[in-house]
Swiss-Prot record:
Keywords: Aspartyl protease, Cell membrane, Hydrolase, Membrane, Protease, Transmembrane, Transmembrane helix. Belongs to the peptidase A8 family. The lineage of its organism: Bacteria, Bacillati, Mycoplasmatota, Mycoplasmoidales, Mycoplasmoidaceae. This is Lipoprotein signal peptidase. Its EC number is 3.4.23.36. The gene is lspA. It comes from Mycoplasmoides gallisepticum (strain R(low / passage 15 / clone 2)) (Mycoplasma gallisepticum).
Length: 304
């Protein structure tokens, strides 16, 4: 029970931090105007097209080559899916709108800020469209259906502008994530090669005349050899010439300590040496990725 409560508290704190980060003053001046403008234009285009094609009449069909205009009503969701059960489209499109609106609120990613409104308002447009009755040519009023009119080929599914917004949003988000993953891997590989070579040499690589610029980093000892850490501007290094701490990161497993400690700089889990039963010194688990935050025994005792 205690573990579950701790998990809920941690989740709550994470959500609060994410919300604050995604709604900082500078960011909300950009993201919510984007949401409003894109929402306005998506809804405007959807219902201008709906009105235009309704005037052409249900059943109207013309072909311009690649694009065929085929005006029909659709009781399903995008591309005529689930058209046998009227409850499913309402549920799916409403959930889609709510989920992606919440995702937008908690997002600070620039690509998502631009693309999520396409999906959100595409889904909302279909929900509104479905709630507006359509009068057929024979005078029959049809409810719980959207108006579809675009078709690539005679044999393909028929869709509307809201469907285009949803599919385009999903496709571009997927493409963005693929590109980000590729760039992150490339950057990480490049960074690992460059920083590892630099750190392996450590204090040895700093000329004697340059060492005077480095000062003791008060109360910070190397988590691996317990020697004094040195600091110069925003760079930190172990003063032990024989300390190859970058190699030892492999034996420093993320071991939770009492009142689990997180790095104050990057919020990653703090680690200790496997044989350090007293947790004399802790270091950020990203110690080999240029996050040099450490915590001495003295600091731990003060926080207890």
């Amino acid at each position: 029970m205690y573990t579950f409560k701790r998990y809920l508290t941690k989740t709550k704190d994470t959500l609060i931090r994410q919300f604050k980060a995604a709604n900082a003053k500078k960011l909300i001046k950009i993201k919510y105007p984007i949401l409003a403008v894109m929402g306005f234009f998506v809804l405007l285009i959807v219902f201008v097209l709906r009105d235009y094609f309704l005037k052409l009449g249900i059943g109207h069909s013309t072909s311009t080559g690649f694009i065929t205009i085929n005006v029909i009503t659709n009781s399903g969701v995008g591309f005529s899916l689930f058209n046998q059960n009227p409850a499913v489209p309402y549920l799916l499109q409403s959930l889609l709108t709510i989920i992606f609106l919440i995702t937008f609120i908690f997002s600070k990613n620039k690509a998502l800020i631009v693309l999520l409104p396409l999906i959100t308002f595409g889904g909302l447009a279909n929900v509104i469209d479905r709630s507006v009755p359509v009068t057929l040519s024979n005078g029959t009023v049809e409810t719980n259906s959207v108006l579809d009119y675009f078709q690539f080929f005679r044999s393909s599914a028929i869709f509307n502008f809201a469907d285009i917004c949803i599919v385009t949003g999903f496709a571009l988000i997927f493409l963005t994530f693929v590109v980000d993953i590729f760039l992150d891997l490339k950057k990480k590989n490049k960074k690992t090669v460059s920083t590892t070579n630099k750190q392996l040499h450590g204090w040895k690589s700093i000329p004697l005349e340059e060492r005077s610029k480095w000062n003791d980093w008060a109360d910070h000892k190397c988590v691996f050899c317990n020697q004094q850490m040195m600091i110069n501007s925003n760079e930190v290094i172990c003063s032990n010439e024989e300390c190859a701490y970058i190699d030892l990161i492999n034996i420093a497993k993320p071991i939770s300590v009492e009142k689990q400690e997180n790095c104050l700089i990057c919020n990653s889990e703090m680690i200790k040496k496997v044989d350090d039963k007293q947790a004399s010194f802790l270091a950020c688990s990203r110690f080999n990725e240029k996050c040099y935050y450490t915590k001495s025994c003295k600091q731990i005792e003060n926080n207890a």
